[in-house]
Curated annotation (Swiss-Prot):
SUPFAM superfamilies: Pentapeptide repeat-like
Record note on quaternary structure: Interacts with the host kinesin light chain (KLC), a subunit of the kinesin-1 motor complex.
Protein name, as recorded: Secreted effector protein PipB2
Reported induction: Expression of the gene is regulated by the two-component regulatory system SsrA/SsrB. It is also activated by SlyA and controlled by the two-component regulatory system PhoP/PhoQ. Expressed in host macrophages and when grown in an acidic environment.
InterPro entries the record matches: 5peptide_repeat (IPR001646), PipB2_N (IPR048984)
Signal sequence segment: none
Ranges for domain Pentapeptide repeat: 162-201, 202-241, 247-286, 287-326
Keyword S-adenosyl-L-methionine: no
Subcellular location: Secreted; Host membrane
Organism of provenance: Salmonella typhimurium (strain LT2 / SGSC1412 / ATCC 700720)
Function: Effector proteins function to alter host cell physiology and promote bacterial survival in host tissues. Involved in the reorganization of late endosome/lysosome (LE/Lys) compartments in mammalian cells. Necessary and sufficient to link kinesin-1 onto the Salmonella-containing vacuole (SCV) membrane. Required for centrifugal extension of lysosomal glycoprotein-rich membrane tubules, known as Salmonella-induced filaments (Sifs), away from the SCV and toward the cell periphery. Required for virulence, but not for intracellular survival and replication in phagocytic cells.
UniProt entry keywords in alphabetical sequence: Host membrane, Membrane, Repeat, Secreted, Virulence
Effect of N343A: Increases LAMP-1 redistribution. No effect on peripheral accumulation of GFP-PipB2
Length: 350
């Protein structure tokens, strides 16, 4: 019995103290020699049983929080009780009048027997908020609650049209997620993973995507005005028809990105890399591309009036039917073909 209580207490600590994939694997692995033997001869039966119990613990916690809190932003209750978890009572006692330890105390009891553990309050609250986020947006609970970096695990989530204004999505995993038409105005997505996500038509104005991964993402028609994309990875992203007015893309990796039809007026793309990028019928008036790597990029029918390409790498860059009035190219590196084009057609603007 005590070993069962110990196991459940360990699961509770792993689920609500860490919530990561590694924590889940550790909590559901066989613990004793006998369990290892049984697990082997049942082709993982012990692990499957433990994983089922782990998932039930998470789902019960989510439902309990949802039923006891008026909304996701409300303070957590000082005492959270989960009854009948495999015949046991699981109680979470938060710091307060009855708990001066500063940690969340987990008590698992059955009859006269009990086991206790302690969980850092900050981790516990972050995990509870992640469970409530999933409840609010009708997402099924996942046994992996957080990423290794401490962000929410929302991999493959369907959040079409969701209102995520000012949401904290730092270090979250939204790879493969569908956020078409969602509103992420002023959202903090620093370090988040949006690889392969659908962000078509999303409102991302004034949002923070610093060092975020947007590789292979679809962002057609999205609004990114005044967004912070410094150091972000946008390789192979589709930004067709995006509005990126005064967007900060300095140092971003935009290799092979498609920016056709995008509006990049006064966008800061200094130090960005756009090798092999396709930029057709875009508006880039006053854009800053100093020190940018534009090798083999293709500019077709694009308005670059007043753009700054000083010190940029323009080797084998294609400029066709573009507006290049008042263009700055001081100390830019150019291939012979690019230099010839400028000399022949736009010498008055160099």
């Amino acid at each position: 019995m005590e070993r069962s209580l110990d196991s459940l207490a360990g699961m509770a600590k792993s689920a609500f103290g860490a919530g990561t994939s590694a924590a889940m694997r550790q909590a559901t692995s066989p613990k004793t020699i006998l369990e290892y033997i049984i697990n082997f001869f049942t082709c993982g039966g012990i692990r499957r049983r433990n994983e089922t119990q782990y998932q039930e613990l998470i789902e019960t916690m989510a439902e309990t929080l949802k039923s006891t809190m008026p909304d996701r932003g409300a303070p957590l209750p000082e005492n959270i009780i989960l009854d009948d978890m495999d015949g046991c009572r699981v109680e979470f006692n938060l710091p307060g009048e009855n708990n001066e330890a500063g940690q969340v105390i987990v008590r698992v009891s059955k009859g006269d027997h009990s086991e206790t553990r302690e969980i850092p309050l900050a981790s516990f609250e972050k995990i509870c908020r992640a469970l409530l986020f999933r409840c609010e947006f009708s997402l099924p609970q996942d046994s992996v609650i957080l990423t290794a970096q401490g962000g929410m695990n929302l991999k493959g989530a369907v959040l079409t049209g969701a209102n995520l204004t000012s949401e904290n999505l730092c270090d979250a995993d939204l790879s493969g997620a569908n956020l078409e038409g969602a509103v992420l105005f002023m959202a903090d997505c620093e370090g988040a993973n949006f690889k392969g996500a659908n962000l078509s038509g999303t409102s991302l104005g004034d949002s923070n995507f610093k060092n975020a991964c947007l590789e292979d993402s679809i962002m057609c028609g999205a609004t990114l005005d005044h967004a912070n994309l410094t150091g972000a990875n946008l390789q192979h992203a589709s930004l067709l028809g995006c509005s990126m007015i005064e967007c900060n893309c300095s140092g971003a990796n935009m290799d092979h990105t498609n920016l056709s039809g995008a509006t990049l007026i006064r966008a800061d793309m200094s130090g960005a890399t756009l090798q092999g990028a396709t930029i057709m019928a875009a508006i880039m008036e006053g854009a800053v591309l100093t020190r940018a790597n534009l090798r083999k990029a293709s500019f077709i029918s694009t308005n670059l009036d007043g753009a700054d390409l000083a010190e940029a790498n323009l080797n084998n860059t294609c400029f066709k039917d573009c507006t290049l009035t008042d263009l700055r190219t001081e100390d830019a590196t150019m291939s012979t073909s690019t230099q010839t084009l400028f000399n022949e057609f736009y010498s008055e603007n160099i």
